[in-house]
Amino acid sequence: MRSWNGNPGGDSLSTKHITEKTGVNINIVTPTGDVSEELNLMMISGTLPDLISLGSWETCYNTLYEQGYTYALNELADQYDPYFWKVVDGSVVAWHTKSDGNLYCVPNDAYGAEQMAETGMTAAVQTFLVRKDLYEDMGSPDMSTPEGFLNTLRTLKNEYATYKGVDITPFYAQGGSGYGLTSYLQNFLAVPYEEDGKIYDRISNPDYIEWLKTFRQAYQEGLIGIDYLVDSDDQVTEKSNNGAYFCMLREWSGMQEANAILASSENPDSYYIAIDGPANSNGDAPLIFPGSLDGWMSTFISKDCKDPARAIAFLTYMLSEEGQKDIFLGIEGETYEVVDGKPQLTDEMIELMNSDPNTFATQYGL
């Protein structure tokens, strides 16, 4: 069971391949209502799924291990599959080990400092995006300074309020003022978290205050509205898919579907590209959030699982390099190939991923 993403997975090429290799049939169940309510009912009735992937923000997250509904993974690994310790990052394990000394779950999308240093890989997805054709028609202006940002929005208001038949919404900030205009913007301005070994007050940073004044001025001049504060997720999706936003402080991972739709539309250059966004007065490169030890979704093995030995072995496989290749790349020679010693999706798969992400996900499971 997982609390997010309803793709059942079992009929895709990737999941069939994994079943053939491991003997494990994958049946993904996603809650139809409140995840904590459904899991609480399962706890009471003794019908918890074998594996549970859950966000740490869910109210039942702590209940699962504090009230004994899930196994300690360290104990299962020591008893049945010591190779588990070879495929998990030590710093991630230490971060998620509870006060009783047990590890009850492993997160995805978690990045330890050692891993980032060794591989150069991070989870950075924060971008400043503009609609490509509109931005280029405006002369690709510099928007990294308060003056440049305001002048660009003035040009937009005066000359491009409607563009190629679309009413343009000037600006969107992901998460509104609680994320897009706080930590997200501060990261673009390279505002530090600490200075001389002490916690730094990012809110009072002069460059950050200057940019907040810039957004206030933009609102006062009618250059931006309050759409980014009040639009629902469905409204944001609709506007994105229609190329209705001009610029956005938005995580790139949320734009893949929209860009695929726009690239195949009657205006194929209406997709979004990343450019240099708001910067501090020194013009420093942004300090984009690279990922954390927390990760995102964490996976537990429930005590209703009838074969915990196979469950920990399957979890170990999924965390291993072999499992990660099977999950993200599929089958060598069919969906990916090795070029210069590095695996990469075939050109056909890349084209499908960009043009039809739904088919890419449901048919191939990648």
Where are these regions (language model features)?
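Extracytoplasmic/secretory soluble proteins
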Residues: M1-L366
